[in-house]
């Protein structure tokens, strides 16, 4: 049985601040898009912190966020249009990353997940 690891709102807020401090100077994002449902809360938080629009659909140069990248399926399309090209279209960010068979790796993540634990987000 997997051990549950509970993230707090403070940890999520710290992550948002890390992203803000890391990327605000590096890349002028056109907006932030959150994958439904897990990425929406992070997208709203980042939209406020970065003072950029919350997008209803992703656009070139935007930040794409999700709560977790585990199977890689939800981020696969964006990953193929991000890291695999010389001109980067998207920056992918998740709270949690787990190695997956699709080899999808976000540009930035906070927690590497292992097979022996399960992350529970504060909004769950």
Regions found by a protein language model. Name each.
Residues 1-124:
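PRPP-associated nucleotide enzymes
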């Amino acid at each position: 049985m997997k051990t549950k690891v509970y993230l707090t709102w403070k940890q999520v807020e710290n992550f948002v601040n890390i992203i803000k401090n890391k990327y605000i100077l590096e890349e002028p994002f056109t907006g932030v898009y959150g994958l439904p449902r897990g990425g929406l809360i992070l997208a709203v938080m980042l939209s406020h912190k970065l003072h950029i629009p919350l997008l209803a659909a992703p656009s070139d140069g935007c930040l794409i966020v999700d709560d977790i990248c585990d199977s890689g399926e939800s981020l696969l399309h964006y990953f193929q249009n991000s890291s695999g090209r010389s001109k980067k279209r998207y920056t992918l960010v998740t709270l949690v990353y787990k190695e997956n068979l699709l080899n999808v790796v976000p540009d930035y993540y906070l927690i590497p997940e292992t097979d022996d634990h399960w992350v529970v987000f504060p909004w769950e």
